[in-house]
């Protein structure tokens, strides 16, 4: 008779010196952990492990974009994939619920969970098993799938089209200048996160302000990089936010006003944003778009962006 598996010990890291313990399981963002801890984007008390003896059988961690901020995102959730089911899933759920109860205030909204996954994860049995095991645990805790996304990369040496002259680009003059354009772009958006903001009861204007204040206001690269696209007569067409986040040069946001969609302006605007970053001598530019946002995905492909990875995001509608 096979003995029942022992109950795991579930606890947070005692300090940054236990990072090696945390890294006994692996994920594609392991190389960022040390710097995240040093800069306050991650804290030992947000980093939890499930242990059987000295064997790590599960781990998770939350992340924040600002030193001293509350947890904004659950971006690490790993299990020992050599374990059989249901043992693997039971450990994962116990780890998730124990850590959540300890880290997040009772009744507060749970931060979104996201994971980077191979682009062919559905065709690769091993990758599919890893992905589906995480999804099952999250669903058991009450989460639902929000969206699957394409992660994209432009690489130095890839040609960027010259400015066609169809549009005139100017710098953003301030918060209101950009928010006033973001709001109409959000109306009718194909972006799942944008749709979720509107479904929560926020107006398009409120959702735009929230996006600006929580993300764009904290970007450390110059606002002089940001561009508003106009027709030669001065009518705004759209905008692009080239920037650098804590890890990579990125196209943080791009949009075309509803009345100007269908004219191919997205190609001109994306090219301008890419040119701004390429002029800084970067070796890559990262971007992402929803799997279902076919027009945006096709625009990135036309400009030579490669789909190197995918991601999925899950959310909890209740605390």
Regions found by a protein language model. Give the residues of each.
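Acyl-donor-binding surface of acyltransferase catalytic domains
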Residues: 1, 88-173, 314
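Short amphipathic alpha-helix that is part of the acyltransferase structural core
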Residues: 1-36, 163-206
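Active-site rim helix/loop that mediates acceptor-substrate recognition in acyltransferases
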Residues: 23-52, 61, 196-231
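Conserved donor-binding loop and adjoining core beta-sheet/short helix segment
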Residues: 36-120, 232, 240-249, 257
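A structural microfeature
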Residues: 58, 147-148, 238, 309
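Conserved acetyl-CoA-binding loop-helix of GNAT-fold acetyltransferases
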Residues: 85-104, 256, 262-279, 294-302
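Conserved active-site tyrosine of GNAT-family acetyltransferases
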Residues: 134, 138, 300, 305
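Hydrophobic adenine-recognition pocket in adenosine-nucleotide-binding enzymes
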Residues: 254-256, 289
